[in-house]
């Protein structure tokens, strides 16, 4: 550490820690939480054309989804979270693909992780906009986050999961880059009610 300052890298950190030292009731699972926050990264040693602009930011906004579930249901929860993130990208009409990370690329804290990448028309390459992970009992063990079985009152570690939904700067850039028309930038249909217009052009006030 270079100093004693701490900024969150993702909302997963404070949201998951809400349940530190908790013994949850089985009937209350799964617990689902969503948080929007600023995220901070040192990105030490990042420089050059491949990490400029939106590729590597020290601060950006992101929506995070978090789940706490029983071990036997955690992979069903993972599938539901994957469907949720994929649904967002479909509604935004963005070209995307999903990667299942191998053991060499996955964080040591996660048991299974999927990355979502959108196509950057300007850079002509795929950029990550979401990671969805099942940590199984790794985080719960450190948090002492447990649940009590309804039948025999046995206490067991929960499983924790989290995902980005989504990293906003790259999503905004992808919307702009992939919706270029001779008339201007087309706004995805799902966003029109929020924007109040269908096209972004030089005629707008």
Task: Please give the residue ranges for each predicted region.
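TRNA-recognition modules of translation machinery and tRNA-sensing kinases, especially anticodon-binding
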Residues: 1-205
């Amino acid at each position: 550490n270079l100093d004693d300052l701490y900024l969150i890298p993702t909302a997963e950190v404070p949201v998951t820690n809400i349940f530190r030292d908790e013994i949850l009731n089985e009937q209350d699972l799964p617990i689902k939480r969503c948080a929007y926050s600023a995220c901070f990264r040192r990105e030490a040693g990042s420089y050059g054309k491949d990490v400029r602009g939106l590729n590597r930011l020290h601060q950006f906004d992101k929506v995070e989804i978090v789940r706490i579930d029983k071990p036997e249901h955690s992979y069903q929860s993972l599938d539901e979270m994957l469907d949720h993130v994929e649904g967002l990208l479909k509604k935004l009409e963005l070209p995307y693909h999903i990667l299942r990370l191998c053991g060499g690329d996955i964080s040591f804290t996660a048991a299974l992780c999927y990355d979502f990448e959108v196509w950057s028309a300007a850079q002509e390459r795929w950029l990550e906009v979401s990671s969805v992970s099942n940590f199984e009992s790794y985080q719960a063990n450190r948090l002492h986050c447990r649940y009590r079985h309804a039948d025999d009152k046995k206490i067991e570690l929960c499983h924790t999961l989290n995902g980005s939904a989504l990293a906003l700067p790259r999503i905004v850039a992808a919307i702009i880059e992939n919706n270029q028309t001779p008339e201007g930038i087309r706004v995805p249909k799902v966003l029109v009610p929020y924007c109040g217009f269908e096209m972004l052009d030089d005629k707008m006030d």
